[in-house]
Design a protein with these regions (language model features):
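FabD-like malonyl-/acyl-CoA
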Residues: 1-141, 146, 192, 269-287, ...
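Alpha/beta catalytic cores of group-transfer enzymes, especially the acyltransferase/condensing modules
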Residues: 10-12, 37-39, 100-251
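Non-catalytic positions within long, well-ordered alpha-helices that form the structural scaffold/packing
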Residues: 77, 182, 263-266
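NAD(P)-dependent dehydrogenase/reductase Rossmann-like domain
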Residues: 174, 213, 218, 266, ...
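Generic hydrophobic alpha-helical scaffold/packing signal
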Residues: 227, 246, 259-263, 280, ...
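A short, acidic, amphipathic alpha-helical segment used as a generic capping/interface helix at domain edges
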Residues: 250-267
Length: 312
């Protein structure tokens, strides 16, 4: 068996995520608390109760999701479950890099907290959005975006799986492109629960900020390969992690290509780490049964997974 860890991105977060894991697994609790110490707000309160209603704001979402991922990774590692490859959707790429030993948990959380603030700042003062477009291929959707560009910036920003693309940018342009997409044959258009036009050119200033921030980060060698969003595969010898993270925030996420590459590499099992089952769905729609995917969000799911892995 070749195993990949797949780390979820923004959009699946919800109040209460991780609370049962925190109570059930000491390793989760230790890693989560270590992560929480890297930010200047009560990360546990935001994750578990979100009384202030800020969890969906990207500067909070990102470190909270990263802390959740760190906790789950720690439990899996303690149980002897380690991956041959890792990848993460957008934000999840930082957790994949932490899992591969490129930087520690606190650095991952500090970076994603910084990234969240930089992305929020890049979107400040603009009315923006992102919408999933179902049932329309890339070429006709790109034509819709080109036509809608007179309303503002709109670009394809996520290539999730066959039949599911995401567009983002100025809300008026996104809405116009979605309307055109439906007329062109798209099955549905669904606005996403995110707070900015992520992975579009509107994030250019966030990319600049990340480039400067990464100058102070020591990137250790990977313990196993990570597949990068903006490439859809492992990094080349001429690539640097800092440059890829800078590019990632302002360019499309090549997730479908990433999943196909994992299958080419012989991966036949994957664990989705994070709330929700979005990545599991993308894997199934992309490579069918070639990769068995196990989503893990709750203590019960994790306990079942550990039993499954023990018997594998």
């Amino acid at each position: 068996m070749k195993l990949a860890f797949l780390y979820a991105g923004q959009g699946s977060q919800h109040a209460g995520m991780g609370q049962d894991l925190y109570e059930a697994f000491p390793a989760f609790r230790a890693a989560f608390d270590e992560a929480a110490a890297a930010v200047d707000f009560d990360l546990k309160e935001v994750c578990f109760t979100d009384a202030a209603g800020v969890l969906n704001e990207t500067q909070y979402t990102q470190p909270c999701m990263t802390a959740f991922a760190a906790g789950l990774t720690a439990v899996l590692r303690e149980a002897g479950v380690t991956p041959d490859y890792a990848a993460g959707l957008s934000l999840g790429e930082y957790s994949a890099l932490a899992c591969a030993g490129v930087f520690d948990v606190q650095t991952a959380v500090a970076l994603t907290a910084f990234r969240g603030k930089a992305m929020a700042a890049a979107a400040a003062g603009r009315t923006c959005g992102m919408t999933a477009v179902l049932g329309l291929d890339e070429a006709p959707l790109q034509a819709c975006c080109n036509t809608a560009a007179d309303e503002g910036v709109v670009q394809i920003c996520n290539y999730n799986c066959p039949g599911q693309l995401v567009i983002g940018g100025d809300k008026a342009a996104v809405d116009k492109a979605a309307e055109l997409a439906l007329a062109a044959g798209a099955r549905r258009c669904l606005p996403l629960n995110v707070s900015g036009p992520f992975h579009t050119s509107l994030m250019h200033s966030a990319g600049d900020a990340l480039r400067e921030k990464c100058k102070a980060v020591r990137f250790a060698p990977m313990q196993f390969p990570v597949l990068f969003n903006c490439l859809g595969h492992e990094m080349e010898e001429t690539d640097t992690i800092a440059a890829l993270l800078e590019k990632q925030v302002q360019s499309g996420v090549r997730w479908e290509v990433t999943v196909r590459r994992l299958a080419e590499l012989g991966v036949d099992a994957a664990i989705e780490i994070g709330p929700g089952r979005a990545l599991t769905g993308f894997v199934k729609k992309t490579v069918g049964s070639a990769i068995s995917c196990y989503p893990v969000e709750t203590a019960a799911q994790l306990q079942q997974l550990l039993r499954t892995m023990k018997g594998a």
